[in-house]
Design a protein with these regions (language model features):
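Helicase C-terminal subdomain and adjacent C-terminal extension
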Residues: 632-662, 679, 692, 763, ...
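Charged C-terminal transducer/switch regions of large nucleotide-driven machines
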Residues: 117-120, 128-470
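Conserved motor-coupling elements within RecA-like helicase/translocase cores
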Residues: 129-130, 563-567, 770-800
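A short beta-strand element within the Helicase C-terminal
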Residues: 588-595, 795-807, 811-815, 841-842
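Conserved helicase NTPase catalytic core signature
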Residues: 1-45, 211, 220, 230-249, ...
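Conserved helicase/translocase motor-coupling segment
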Residues: 686-764
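Short beta-strand-loop-alpha-helix junction that forms the active-site gateway
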Residues: 932-990
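ASCE P-loop NTPase helicase motor core
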Residues: 44-51, 56-59, 67-69, 73-132, ...
């Protein structure tokens, strides 16, 4: 119908669009889902696009299992009450499609136009369909659906809780976990246990300035013990100028103290004074000397030689003596008064001798306390200078005391032991570096404390945190605090490990049961539609009844007069292009047509199908197939294919006007070189294969290349086609395979019909010599075959030998005509050759690519050349890597050789790196994997032979029991965006099942 829109020949209509209009899989009602087979995310997107009603093409590379997708598209459409016509050119394709229907249990919904039924058989088939509808029972899935929805919702809530961002902080639980894993990745990373409250977290959203201030505080020893044990700690200094002045004052004090102490020591030695231990004692000593000096202006110095208490009593009044209980005769008083006057210096008149003598007595008592032995006082000549120096020192100390008021040692300098004071001044002088940064340190500390960071500052100081970690400590405190708030906010939605595993396990069981019940649900749905249409299509229902009850049943009449009821009873029809045109009237329409083999079917052959449907979906692989002309008579051997008419495939034509989708998931393994080359050069790098481990029951595909040296060998054929040495070598490989691995199917594919014929004849001849190998070559489902590329498209075997079949000229030059690879469709032949093997592909060739000039090659021969070169380069790399591997197992084991110096692999994800660190902490050696395999975990020796039940597979155990087991791991975080975008079914059941199957 789209082709009919081409009003002007040669003018392309605008390209149509195709979109997935279905709700996300995780939001759908399970009761409405009708998929019969598991589908990966890419295939599910294609199925949903089909259900949305769009026409498009599907590129299906070998190994992507397009028939599974076709069955799912058909079942999903039938679940919507639609009819589906499936057309395939090849009987093998339709047979495989039918086998899938039978396996899923919905074969009764199909009408096979290829089956040769008479009228009664056709009538019986429609009657069986009515009986099927009338007996169909709606499965009781209510409890199952509730469990599926509940567990799915819990897993969705868990992932959303991991990824939902806080409206203010713009972070998620997952990003917080990643950041914390990054912060704590190293052994010397941050370790603070300080937590912030919500207001503090809000205030620290922009914390660059705070981080810079903390780092600066660390640079100026803000978190070093020296900063708090410094004699300047808590000093009151506002700026650098005050710090410099304080330091200069200390230097002055040190000098003044030293000079004064020396002078005081000299004075003490001269006067017989005890050496003062404090400035206060110096003050007392100088004070008594000053007073004595004043007294000696009136009295002689010997007045201090003895006590003058009797003189004091004699010169006192009678009342004083009575008050003090002293009795003294007048004669005695007279004598003592005369004696007292003898101490008075000549010319000095003392008005109150009694009071002056009391002063002398007090001074004498104080003098005695300061001298080491009794002696007459002397007044040093430099007394005034000493007093002035002392006053200056005390004044300077008072200035220092203002600065050091809040220090732990205090500021009582005058009562401080002189040695301690001297030591303190020395300490103050020695700590100049900390002093000069003190104002900035105090200012930063005060500023940060005002921001509410006191607890963090105290913690950083208590742990003596190095400057380079300070910033990370702030980050750890912020992110850990934020994470705890986020966890509280999402409490109930986030699942811990045990609950997550339990919920996933419940979902897997429910989803598996749900998929198992899909056929019953689809049959019940078809039965409901049948019941509804009996009412809505009353006339057609009546005609159907009359036909089934009538004497003669004519299918064409039924399809003409009751097409809706026919499609409702049997909503899935399969046919070849020719059977469709022959058996179905042109008026019979279907909702959707699925065109299988569309890359190898000419457009003209599929026009009857295309014009019968509003929705057209073409599946095929234009890179591995092409249409061939229909030939009635047998061709002459060796005759070239007719080239008069250029055939356009259905796929190629529809691809010019319809959007294209590509099945991306490969369900079988390929050698990495083959997969990389095909993916890059043919499939736009859209293909993806699950990684395969050596522990898998389906080992990774392998590619081996063998070049036959023809030098000095004489071939039985004179031309370059099918050299005898290659035929002989391939025959030997076939016999070797039959003997060594008879459980694996085998085929030989060649690049020319002649070479295929010669190899087949050679194998038949060899078999007569080795009859014991005959069972391997017996006919069967996957019997041994030898075919050329044109007949290999539908063939698949465990092992395939691709024999090029091209030799050299007599002069030894390499041929540039590589048979069918060099032909027009050689690129398709190349893809076919590389994709026929499920397990192992062996290429045998007499021509080495190093002998060829790629500029002289054409079509698939160019691809063949480049593939061989890439294979050789990979082999060379692997040889280099093998030589760089660990010490050979044959060497004696010892701790030195067993030590692994390899760096810890960086997986590009901090949580996964944390996993690696934890594995290593348990003695597991971890090495980097390749491709999707994130890492290889080598178990400790004591665990090397033990299975790992949690992973569902046994470890790969070396034949040498001393070699640790190797477990390949595909790892991802459940908060990764790719993980979150995947449906719960994909990430919880399908992906783990795929990885389990591949080891």
């Amino acid at each position: 119908r789209d082709l009919a829109a081409l009003k002007v020949p040669g003018v392309k209509p605008r390209e149509l669009n195709a979109h997935n209009l279905q709700p996300p899989l995780d939001q759908r009602d399970p009761a409405e889902e009708m998929l019969l087979l598991d589908a990966d995310a890419n295939a599910h997107e294609i199925i949903d696009t089909a259900v949305s009603g769009f026409s498009f093409t599907i590129t299906a590379a070998p190994g992507t299992e397009p028939l599974r997708t076709a069955v799912n598209i058909a079942s999903a459409l039938m679940g919507r009450g639609k009819s589906v016509l499936v057309v395939g050119e090849k009987r093998s394709t339709l047979a495989e499609f039918s086998a899938l229907l039978k396996r899923t249990g919905i074969e009764s919904l199909r009408y096979d136009l290829l089956a040769e039924h008479d009228a009664e058989a056709q009538r019986a088939e429609f009657i069986r369909a009515i009986v099927r509808n009338e007996s169909a029972e709606e499965p009781n899935s209510e409890d199952l659906n509730e469990e599926l929805v509940a567990t799915r919702a819990a897993l969705l809530d868990h992932t959303r809780a991991l990824l939902n961002k806080d409206s203010n902080w713009q972070i998620s639980v997952y990003s917080a976990l990643q950041r914390l894993a990054e912060l704590t990745a190293s052994e010397d990373g941050p370790a603070t246990r300080v937590r912030f409250d919500r207001p503090m977290l809000d205030s620290l959203m922009e914390r660059e300035q705070v981080r810079a201030e903390l780092v600066r505080l660390g640079e100026i020893d803000g978190f070093a013990s020296a900063s708090r044990t410094s004699p300047w700690y808590r000093a009151r200094l506002v700026n650098d100028e005050e710090a410099a002045e304080a330091y200069a004052l200390v230097i002055t004090l040190k000098s003044s103290l030293l000079n004064l102490r020396e002078a005081m020591n000299q004075t003490s030695a001269m006067l017989g004074l005890r050496r003062g231990r404090t400035i206060s004692e110096w003050e007392s000593q100088l004070a008594i000397l000053m007073r004595i000096r004043e007294t000696l202006k009136r009295f002689r110095a010997d007045v201090y030689d003895r006590p003058v208490t009797d003189l004091i009593a004699a010169t006192a009044s009678g009342a004083w003596r009575r008050e003090n209980g002293i009795e003294m005769s007048s004669m005695q008083r007279s004598r003592l008064r005369r004696a007292a006057k003898e101490y008075i210096l000549p010319g000095v008149n003392i008005g109150d001798l009694h009071e002056q003598l009391k002063i002398v007595q007090a001074e004498r008592a104080e003098w005695i306390r300061h001298i080491e032995a009794p002696r007459t006082p002397q007044i040093p000549e430099n007394l005034d200078q000493l007093a002035a120096a002392l006053n200056s020192l005390v004044s300077e100390l008072a200035g220092l005391g203002i600065v050091l008021t809040d220090t732990i040692e205090g500021t009582d300098f005058v009562r401080t032991d002189l040695d301690a004071l001297d030591a303190r001044l020395d300490a103050l002088m020695a700590d100049r570096v900390l002093l000069m940064t003190l104002p900035e340190r105090d200012a930063l500390t005060q500023k940060l404390r005002e921001r509410g960071l006191s607890e963090l500052l105290d913690d950083l100081y208590a742990r003596q945190v190095p400057t380079e970690v300070v910033s990370a400590e702030l980050e750890l405190a912020w992110w850990q605090s934020a994470l705890e708030f986020l966890l509280q906010h999402h409490e109930g939605k986030l699942l811990d490990g045990d609950r997550l595993r339990d919920t996933e396990s419940r979902f897997r069981r429910a989803d598996y049961a749900h998929m198992t019940s899909a056929p019953a649900r689809l049959l019940a749905k078809v039965a409901r539609v049948w019941t509804e249409r009996i009412e809505s299509e009353h006339d057609q229902a009546a005609y159907l009844k009359s036909q089934l009850r009538g004497y003669e049943f004519v299918l064409e009449e039924l399809l003409t007069h009751a097409p809706v009821m026919a499609r409702t009873l049997l909503p899935l029809w399969t046919a070849s292009p020719f059977a469709l045109a022959r058996k179905v009237p042109a008026s019979m329409r279907f909702d959707t047509v699925l065109l299988l083999d569309s890359e190898s079917t000419p457009l003209a052959a599929n026009l009857p199908a295309i014009t019968r449907a509003d929705q057209v979906i073409a599946l095929g692989d234009p890179h591995s197939g092409y249409p061939s002309p229909f030939i009635v008579s047998a061709p002459t051997f060796g005759a070239p294919e007719p080239t008069d008419e250029q055939l356009d495939s259905t796929f190629d034509v529809l691809a010019t006007i319809l959007p294209n989708r590509t099945l991306a998931m490969l369900h079988r393994s390929m050698d990495p070189v083959i997969l990389d080359y095909l993916n890059r050069e043919f499939y736009g790098s859209q293909l993806h294969a699950a990684p395969v481990s050596r522990a898998s029951a389906q080992p990774a595909g392998s590619l081996t290349v063998e070049y036959i040296d023809t030098r000095g060998k004489v071939s039985d054929n004179a031309n370059l086609d099918s050299p005898g040495v290659e035929v002989e070598r391939v025959t030997n490989l076939v016999l070797e395979h039959a003997y060594r691995t008879p459980d694996r199917s085998l085929a030989v594919v060649t690049a020319s019909p002649k070479h295929a014929q010669r190899v087949a004849e050679s194998v038949r001849h060899a078999l007569s010599l080795y009859p014991q190998l005959a069972p391997f070559f017996a006919a069967g489902e996957e019997s041994f075959r030898v075919v050329d590329l044109t007949r290999a498209e539908t063939l698949e075997r465990d092992t395939v030998i691709f024999s090029l079949g091209v030799g050299r000229a007599r002069l030894g030059q390499a041929s540039y005509d590589l048979g069918q690879l060099s032909a027009e469709h050689g690129r398709q032949g190349f893809v076919v050759a590389l994709t026929r093997a499920r397990r192992a592909l062996r290429i045998v060739s007499c021509i080495d690519p190093s002998e060829l000039d790629p500029q002289k090659l054409h079509h698939g021969a160019v691809d063949f050349y480049h593939l061989l070169r890439e294979h050789a380069e990979r082999q060379a790399r692997e040889e280099v890597e093998a030589k760089a591997q660990r010490v050979p197992e044959t060497l004696p084991r010892n701790a030195f050789l067993a030590a692994d110096d390899a760096d810890t692999p960086d997986l590009g994800d901090w949580l996964l790196n944390d996993l690696v660190a934890r594995l290593q902490a348990h003695g597991v050696r971890v090495t980097r994997g390749e491709g999707d395999i994130a890492l290889i975990a080598h178990a400790p020796e004591k665990l090397a032979a033990e299975p790992v039940p949690a992973l569902g597979v046994a470890p790969v155990v070396s034949s040498n029991p001393s070699v640790p087991a190797a477990m390949p791991l595909v790892a991802c975080s459940d908060g990764e965006p790719n993980y979150a975008r995947a449906s719960v079914r994909e990430r919880t059941r399908l992906l783990p099942e795929r990885l389990s199957r591949t080891g």
